[in-house]
């Protein structure tokens, strides 16, 4: 085939597309741009076919979204080259030349070459292919062959079979996106509540003969005019968003990625407020639109199903005067029932809980609730009957989480609790929450519910035991609903939330003790986590202060339960067994303190030594065997380590009190999720730096560090580290660490050259880059001014602890204890330190500056880093 110069055609097409985009920038009307881009490509393809002819009798057809008449700025151009018979060698060469020319034009075609028989066979086996072919549109070539394809596709179309297949396909797609429209980085095309859901509804309606547009579907009685208007608006919003994503990135990008969200907000003219980022406001708009589509999708799919598979209502069974069981779905007896008696808007959810045979609500009921939600007004909220009903929903033995989720989706919960409405769809760009505030809140309620279920008792033995003994544990659900209710308002959200829950308790007639409990829980829902993860639990004063703040055993149990549920509902990455152990340790210590066991340091020391001695005897050591080692340990050591750790150290060190070589011993932690590491060697300024460098290079995440120097100058350091995700064989890892870390400590200089910092996963790095945490460092004398307390907050990154350790060494600051609190991609660490540099204002300022630089990633890069 002679060479064809495509440049003039390509330039005309590119100029026309640029003009269309410029027009869109002046008047952002999505349908106009999509239609114009489609028209431009249609014209270019018809000209191209004149230059690169189709095989004789063949047809060039647009399929998929392009066939539907929509073309996004950087979407593939989906084409079907339809042949009247299997291709000859000449036909194959013609097709090959045409496809090559498509690429030369810069169109990125998604093409298939098929005969009519091929199309029918592929459509039978793949609902996606069938759908694409149903939307085929003639572009060039044989119109007769195109009509034969249209006729064949319509002839084989079975509306009922098509509906079932598309519903299964949609369910599978939703499952790939975790069945939620509230993803951090939603795909505006494929995620639940996005463009694809809208297309599926229209495909189902079209196949069943109910129309091709929202107006036609409404005329067929499947939609009300207001629902059609809402869906049309949502469709236009999602189309524009997808267009903006393509234009912003210059590629086919349908995901609302973190690093695109600020730019998108700017395109939409959304500005940050004093308390909310512009990107958070943008995403809240997205989530509200996706929620609307998700809800109307449920109603429409059920409506189409009822039309396609009609069944008589004669098998409906009355539940009461207002509701009936219609094919295992809750159905309202009178269509205007919610308008006549708005109290039913809450009672419907209570009935769902009380009738486990119901699998959902009928489309009629869902639609009636949706259209009557405006009846929940101030008068409705003041009605004592409605207040009692709401509490009853929280007090039921089953269905609480399901119905709260359904109430949120149908906009009933946000209307009943207007303060809840403000957090619906509110994203938290704080690097550790992976859900919107409302979804996180419902996840916390779900976690509390799991504590009550016998089938989950083995997962949470202490929590299950405590909630079983807690009087009126439904109060925890109230606290959970309100614990983050004031997020995004500015100020202390815990304090503001406490005021809101106090008002709720008064309005709903909670007795004073219960009202005081939920207010305490909301006000102090972060307290237990902070103390457990940031304070030295071996210090009796820390425990006494915490116990005094909590006040009694009921509050302590409730706070423990809410704290565990809260952390576990934040992100799958935030919770780990080490945090669970810290919280359980604090609970048991505080429980003892509240029970009158106010042990002073001397009592704690004596009891701990006695228990450690008992454990060493069980290991076969005589009492006199440990004396040489214990004589080198001061009171601080015994107070900072529990009896099990002391006995473990003793078993390995009693016979080598002053070894020539470093001693490293490692064992799996008792909770089975990490490693406990002991390092015993002659003390040296860079010891902590070298050890942290090794952990970082091996992707071992330090959770806790206790640094101790014996009376005769040996370092006895203890670490809790978590192995990389997916590493199952902890004993093999322990053996490896024992060998490698000992080698590293023998030659720390070589270690500096060997250390290569690990990298964060790409998505985490992107998120932390777009929404960084402002580095903070606060240095203050500890309670008894024996040492200093350094609190730091920053975006997590590989090598951060190592960088801080280098700053300590460079400034002559000794680490006594480290409490590492990692919240997703945010760290809030506490270090107990000492050193003469901290006693002088000038050197103290230099140290703090160096710490801030290290937190920001600006520390001077040495070869070791």
UniProtKB/Swiss-Prot annotation:
One of its GO terms (biological process) is regulation of nitrogen utilization. Uridylyltransferase (UTase) activity is inhibited by glutamine, while glutamine activates uridylyl-removing (UR) activity. Its EC number is 2.7.7.59, 3.1.4.-. Residues 319-675 are annotated as: Uridylyl-removing. Residues 1-318 are annotated as: Uridylyltransferase. Gene3D superfamilies: 3.30.70.260, Hypothetical protein af1432. SUPFAM superfamilies: ACT-like, HD-domain/PDEase-like, Nucleotidyltransferase, Nucleotidyltransferase substrate binding subunit/domain. Keywords: Hydrolase, Magnesium, Multifunctional enzyme, Nucleotidyltransferase, Repeat, Transferase. Residues 747-767 are annotated as: Disordered. It catalyses: [protein-PII]-L-tyrosine + UTP = [protein-PII]-uridylyl-L-tyrosine + diphosphate; [protein-PII]-uridylyl-L-tyrosine + H2O = [protein-PII]-L-tyrosine + UMP + H(+). Residues 751-767 have a biased composition (Basic residues). SMART domains: HDc. Residues 676-762, 789-865 form the ACT domain. Its cofactor is Mg(2+). One of its GO terms (molecular function) is [protein-PII] uridylyltransferase activity. Residues 437-559 form the HD domain. Pfam families: ACT, GlnD_UR_UTase, HD, NTP_transf_2. Modifies, by uridylylation and deuridylylation, the PII regulatory proteins (GlnB and homologs), in response to the nitrogen status of the cell that GlnD senses through the glutamine level. Under low glutamine levels, catalyzes the conversion of the PII proteins and UTP to PII-UMP and PPi, while under higher glutamine levels, GlnD hydrolyzes PII-UMP to PII and UMP (deuridylylation). Thus, controls uridylylation state and activity of the PII proteins, and plays an important role in the regulation of nitrogen assimilation and metabolism. Has four distinct domains: an N-terminal nucleotidyltransferase (NT) domain responsible for UTase activity, a central HD domain that encodes UR activity, and two C-terminal ACT domains that seem to have a role in glutamine sensing. HAMAP family: PII_uridylyl_transf. Belongs to the GlnD family. This is Bifunctional uridylyltransferase/uridylyl-removing enzyme. The lineage of its organism: Bacteria, Pseudomonadati, Pseudomonadota, Betaproteobacteria, Burkholderiales. The gene is glnD.
